[in-house]
Amino acid sequence: MIKELQGGNMATKFKTDEEMRGDRLTQCLDDIMRASTEMMVQQQLKTIQLNSDVAAGFRKALSKSLGDRVRAFHSILDGVETTLTTASQYLDAVEEAAVKMKQWKQQQEEEQRRKHQAELEKNKRQQEHDAATKAAAAQQLMAQQSPVDLTAPTPTGLASNLDKSNRVGGVKPFSAEFGHLDEMDLSMFGGIDGHGDFSLEDFNMGGNSVPLNGGRPRNMVMADAGGFPARGGMGRGGATAINNGAQEIKTSTNEASTNNRNNDGTGGASNPRISSNYNSAVADHESIGLRVDANGQNTKQSGQQSGAGLNPDDYLTLNDFNDLGIDWNTGENNELDLNDFNI
């Protein structure tokens, strides 16, 4: 065993300086092991006393050298710990810097992506706006070039239904709203006999307005027993055109009763309705007060002047008709039956 230790000690001595200077920690450990080995050898030699020249125990110098080696080893360990701590702190700082750098890069990428997205949205909105502007301009141009539709619905009142068009259904004539006013009996108007404030002369009826028959003046004969002619009457023309549809009223004295012919071509001589109302027609004419002189001119009774004694309050207006409470839409074919009214 001693030989092995001595052989190891000898082998240690043969180490080169370059190998010894390779690592301080390794060198320190080798020194500690060598000093410890020498001390153990000295103690064994003292114990077994193989040689009387061997000093008892290990020497002080050897003990001091071993202590120095141990302190150096501890110093190296402290340095290693400090180095490791510094390295750990450095690694933490590097890691933190790397994390911050990564976060900064992510923020930069996010900002770049956000800017790119905003730019894309801006371009998209601009394109949509341009497209809408072009479409509006094209629509306006088409509207200006297209013809105007004059058949659009036109409401006629505030309460009209806008969904309905005025093109649906025909427009009623004026006579349909108020009945056939041209078929009314002239006897319904008071003061028309020429003595009152309302006479036929005020309508400027000439000599041709009242035909003659054998020199005897006649009024426009009413065809209906109730006072309504079959066609014609008072109406458009201010009560002067009694014969509706006739182009002119004949004034021949040799002609039979041809006044107020109907559209079917029947004359007064063969029309029982006209014949039956002849006397009443003459009486109406005489009551009106028209006279025919030798020259065929209509005159009024003596003492009466045209338009004399007229009272504006006696004129009939639409309000007077409305006061009668007449339903103008009753009857067949918009014909009004005045027999129900005591006029």
Swiss-Prot record:
Location(s), subcellular: Nucleus
Region (Disordered): 105-141, 252-277
One term under GO cellular component: nucleus
Pfam families named among the record's database cross-references: Med2
Keyword field: Activator, Nucleus, Transcription, Transcription regulation
Keyword Membrane attached: no
Major localization class: nucleus
Biased composition range(s): Basic and acidic residues: 107-132
Family: Belongs to the Mediator complex subunit 2 family.
Complexes and interactors: Component of the Mediator complex.
Role according to the record: Component of the Mediator complex, a coactivator involved in the regulated transcription of nearly all RNA polymerase II-dependent genes. Mediator functions as a bridge to convey information from gene-specific regulatory proteins to the basal RNA polymerase II transcription machinery. Mediator is recruited to promoters by direct interactions with regulatory proteins and serves as a scaffold for the assembly of a functional preinitiation complex with RNA polymerase II and the general transcription factors.
Protein name, UniProt field: Mediator of RNA polymerase II transcription subunit 2
Organism: Eremothecium gossypii (strain ATCC 10895 / CBS 109.51 / FGSC 9923 / NRRL Y-1056) (Yeast)
Lineage: Eukaryota, Fungi, Dikarya, Ascomycota, Saccharomycotina
